[in-house]
Amino acid sequence: MIQQETYLNVADNSGAKKLRVIRVIGGFHKKYGTVGDIVVCSVREAIPNSDVKKGDVVRAVIVRTKKEIRRNDGTYIRFDDNAAVLIDKFNAPRGTRIFGPVARELREKGFMKIVSLAPEVW
């Protein structure tokens, strides 16, 4: 359950380290985001000399949440942190590597490039 003002870790090598959510995209007054949702964020921490600077407004897709996700077969999955991957306006990842596992729900939402770069898909 990612909402406005939530801090997210960045799970790629785009140069950002921490993001703060400004808005969850989709629907009218959508309050909460989960795995596969696109969010507009502000970069709160960044690596020096990187493409992304502190204060930049970026789009990201949520790849991990601490709040469990119920799947159609009745199982639940949750992760140790809230994490996102920075994307461009074509929904392609801005980084070239993904760190840590990502949820299988990303495949159903059409983020195949992120799924293929990830070391593990749960």
Swiss-Prot record:
Gene Ontology annotations for the cellular component aspect, listed alphabetically: cytosolic large ribosomal subunit
A GO MF term: large ribosomal subunit rRNA binding
Alphabetic keyword roster: Ribonucleoprotein, Ribosomal protein, RNA-binding, rRNA-binding
GO biological process: translation
Keyword Ribosomal protein: yes
Entries under PANTHER family matching the protein: 50S/60S RIBOSOMAL PROTEIN L14/L23, LARGE RIBOSOMAL SUBUNIT PROTEIN UL14M
Subunit annotation: Part of the 50S ribosomal subunit. Forms a cluster with proteins L3 and L19. In the 70S ribosome, L14 and L19 interact and together make contacts with the 16S rRNA in bridges B5 and B8.
Function: Binds to 23S rRNA. Forms part of two intersubunit bridges in the 70S ribosome.
Similarity-based family: Belongs to the universal ribosomal protein uL14 family.
Name of the protein in its database record: Large ribosomal subunit protein uL14
Lineage: Bacteria, Thermotogati, Thermotogota, Thermotogae, Thermotogales
